[in-house]
Amino acid sequence: MIEKLDFKADIQTVLNDFDTIVKMSPWDDDHQIGLTHRPNATNLWKDSVGSLYTNGKSSGVSENEFTELNAQIPETLKTLLLDFAQSQNIKLGRVRIMRALSKRGLTVHRDTSVRYHLVLKTNIDSFFGFRDLKQTNGVAAHCYHMPADGHFYKVDTTKFHFIYNGGKTERIHLVICPR
């Protein structure tokens, strides 16, 4: 369900670009910063944040609509994203920086396609979990930890999944939705 890819980034360079982005678009209550947006969007940093579904119902917006990279993204990060997309033979859809604060998580859900993750900051008590529908021997979920090792990870988020940050520090991932 989680595949470590050969494609690797210089994590310190990405973190430097991340710091630049947070200065332009500080965190708010949704704990997401969008790096792509729809054509003619008015708030380029926030257009792609949040869920495209509410109570299981589509908002009418598709991942395929997020076709524009924010022009204010540092060039090194922009190049990394485009090189990564080319290496995976995908087109970039929604690209977001997503943060989970200490002792916080996301509810069980599933997405319409796989996601690619680059871990920027994490801790050993931060997990990505997948529901086990069989619940063999009472096991209801399988949890994984993705390290901040510079590798991109392909995650099959079409399966029911959740994240939980049980650590004392924030967890930050760059998340790419292909289109």
Regions found by a protein language model. Give the residues of each.
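Residue-level recognition of conserved beta-strand positions in structured domain cores
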Residues: R110, L120, F130-D132, N165, ...
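A short hydrophobic beta-strand segment most commonly corresponding to one strand
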Residues: Y116-T122, F152-K154, K168-R179
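A short glycine-rich, His/Asp/Glu-containing loop-to-beta-strand
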Residues: L82-S102
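Non-heme Fe(II)/2-oxoglutarate
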Residues: M1-F84
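Intrinsic-disorder/low-complexity, polar/charged segments enriched in Ser/Thr/Lys/Arg/Asp/Glu/Gln
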Residues: I2-K4, S113-R115, R171
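Short beta-strand His + acidic residue motifs that chelate non-heme Fe in jelly-roll/DSBH
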Residues: L106-H109, S126-F128, Y153-G167
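A short beta-strand-loop-beta hairpin characteristic of the jelly-roll/cupin
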Residues: K121-A148
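Short, conserved beta-strand element in jelly-roll/cupin
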Residues: R99, R110-S126
